[in-house]
From Swiss-Prot:
Function: Located at the top of the head of the 30S subunit, it contacts several helices of the 16S rRNA. In the 70S ribosome it contacts the 23S rRNA (bridge B1a) and protein L5 of the 50S subunit (bridge B1b), connecting the 2 subunits; these bridges are implicated in subunit movement. Contacts the tRNAs in the A and P-sites.
Protein source organism: Borrelia garinii subsp. bavariensis (strain ATCC BAA-2496 / DSM 23469 / PBi) (Borreliella bavariensis)
Chain intervals for the UniProt region annotation (Disordered): 95-125
GO MF terms held by the record: rRNA binding; structural constituent of ribosome; tRNA binding
Name of protein: Small ribosomal subunit protein uS13
Subunit field text: Part of the 30S ribosomal subunit. Forms a loose heterodimer with protein S19. Forms two bridges to the 50S subunit in the 70S ribosome.
InterPro entries in the record: Rbsml_uS13_C, Ribosomal_uS13, Ribosomal_uS13-like_H2TH, Ribosomal_uS13_bac-type, Ribosomal_uS13_CS
Pfam families: Ribosomal_S13
Record's keyword terms, sorted: Ribonucleoprotein, Ribosomal protein, RNA-binding, rRNA-binding, tRNA-binding
Domain of life, source organism: Bacteria
PROSITE patterns: RIBOSOMAL_S13_1, RIBOSOMAL_S13_2
SUPFAM superfamilies in UniProt: S13-like H2TH domain
Any one biological process term the GO annotation gives: translation
Length: 125
């Protein structure tokens, strides 16, 4: 089983799909990595030998930001937005959508489960 960037690649999948299990590598980037390391993207991950795994590891670690480092970069950029208190940072802090979506009726994913107000109908009479 190949282990790259602290992630065990799924052994029964094609390399172009198996590489997408690494955070920061999608389909397009997986194909780029395969081309740079001169390995067939349709090769099954369990059929890789140590030389090919080392080439993949070298390409990924030298050219791309993946896994923990990428997660920390994303978290730091969100924290920076919150610290400077720009519009996006304030929306992050409040847990609301950032990009102008309506919030009167939708945005349930971002806002979370409904919080009902007790006796609201009685008070409105």
């Amino acid at each position: 089983m190949a282990r790259i960037s602290g992630i065990d690649l799924p052994s029964n999948k094609q390399l172009k799909i198996a590489l997408t299990s690494i955070y920061g590598i999608g389909r397009t980037r997986a194909l780029e990595v395969c081309n740079k390391s001169s390995i067939s993207p349709s090769k099954i991950a369990k059929d890789l030998d140590n030389d090919e795994v080392n080439r993949l590891r070298k390409v990924i670690e030298s050219d791309y930001v993946v896994e923990g480092k990428l997660r920390s970069e994303v978290a730091m950029s969100i924290k920076r937005l919150m610290d400077i208190a720009c519009y996006r940072g304030v929306r992050h802090r409040k847990g609301l959508p950032l990009r102008g979506q309506r919030t009167k009726t939708n945005a349930r994913t971002r806002k979370g489960k409904r919080k009902t107000v007790a006796n609201k109908k009685i008070a409105s009479k």
